[in-house]
């Protein structure tokens, strides 16, 4: 069982720095000559790899994208030393042993599977996350031995974002949008792995191996890896993983028309029939302003999802008992929904909401419904 991730404390950092300083004063020339096992003896809950990685992090090892020359030096080091990462890092000079290990294991190893993801593999990945959580090391070991842990992590994030963008998927819903994919479990498994210390993530590099213990590495693909953009590691294999934005789905959808809001809110709050009135001055059929999936489905975030057949065929007369006239018009930039017969001639208030989102509109409509208010709702979608 993998150890539970645990953040480094200020006291542990102090002990680490003091111990490394002592070893430098005793003759160690750089971090590749330090006995990390000796350092770990001063920190009962940390091993030599934890200490080495933490040291690299807090002492400002070079970060960011790898240059072509660094990759070339890394490849040369692997050919010469195998997976003795301390020796490889000494040749690279600008990166730590653990950075070299991760760069190799996640990007440059010619045995990695960099092929496009298929739908059945996506389903397997989601099932694996449900079983193992976000322990990418175990998922790689048992499910995708040829994929890098970074590739697995990034694909999971991509699927999560696609799920939030997809028409027909309400955030937090349990419905399945693809064959065999349980999107709810994806959301439950989506955590910010990068918040943990680098020494504690699920895809740590293994400890340095001696020349007798590492498997011979094929270098026939090295030139392919470095020889041009067409064969460079894909974006899914890069070392930077962006945390998922839980509000991404709000940024990529058009704001729904007021008719969509009224129809959805009425189905959600039956009491709205009482104040929306019996005659509507707008299109006879719902004109959805949202995107459609391949099957013609529509979706309004935060509201119950209608089936495509229901959503595209419901007359407004089905919402309230009145006569609706007029043909659909798809040219206007704004829509109006008026409870014409119920609008009072007394004092009125105009409330303007910039960039309204469905959740806000739901709350407003609920308050108005409970107050039995007479309202005029309009939306300018310029």
From Swiss-Prot:
A single GO cellular-component term from the record reads: nucleus
The record's CDD domains line, in alphabetical order, gives:
SANT (cd00167)
- Biased composition of type Acidic residues is found at 194-210
Where does it reside?
Nucleus
- Domain (Myb-like) spans 1-57, 58-108, 109-160
| Keywords from the UniProt entry | Activator, DNA-binding, Nucleus, Repeat, Transcription, Transcription regulation
Alphabetically, the GO molecular function entries are: DNA-binding transcription factor activity, RNA polymerase II-specific; RNA polymerase II cis-regulatory region sequence-specific DNA binding
Spans of biased composition, class Polar residues?
211-240
Region of interest: Disordered: 194-240
InterPro entries for this protein: Homeodomain-like_sf (IPR009057), Myb_dom (IPR017930), MYB_TF (IPR050560), SANT/Myb (IPR001005)
Q: What happens when the gene is disrupted?
A: Impairs the ability to produce 1233A and 1233B.
GO BP: mitotic cell cycle; positive regulation of transcription by RNA polymerase II
Q: In which domain of life is the source organism classified? A: Eukaryota
Family annotation (Pfam families): Myb_DNA-bind_6, Myb_DNA-binding
Induction description = Expression is increased upon exposure to hygromycin B.
Q: Primary place of residence?
A: nucleus
Q: Which PANTHER family does this entry report, sorted A to Z?
A: MYB PROTEIN-RELATED (PTHR45614), MYB-LIKE DOMAIN-CONTAINING PROTEIN-RELATED (PTHR45614:SF265)
Q: What does this protein do?
A: Transcription factor; part of the gene cluster that mediates the biosynthesis of 1233A, a natural compound known as an inhibitor of HMG-CoA synthase in the mevalonate pathway and with antibacterial and antifungal activities. Involved in hygromycin B-induced transcriptional control of the cluster.
* Name of the protein in question: Myb-like transcription factor
